[in-house]
């Protein structure tokens, strides 16, 4: 007996993270860069196949014209509020992240709200 259900879907891989994929991630921490004084490092935690992956994104405190600012970066988070003056309210919240890869290292290419998307679906 054959059917065509799922015929065109890829079977999920048990491989580690894959670049250009979107994952649900928790913002684990924000700290100063060990390499550059003028950057904050956002560390997101992804749990995949029972393994924990920490993926980072560095954002410049004083961005150039072609760089994203910290305020712009935070606006993409699930619980963004202009009234937040510290990172504490963002920690432990879930977000969607797009993972990139550069020279064998993973990084967060982009972030999007997860909770607001789920609320919108419930309210429709």
Please describe what each predicted stretch is.
Residues 1-124:
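Short beta-rich binding modules
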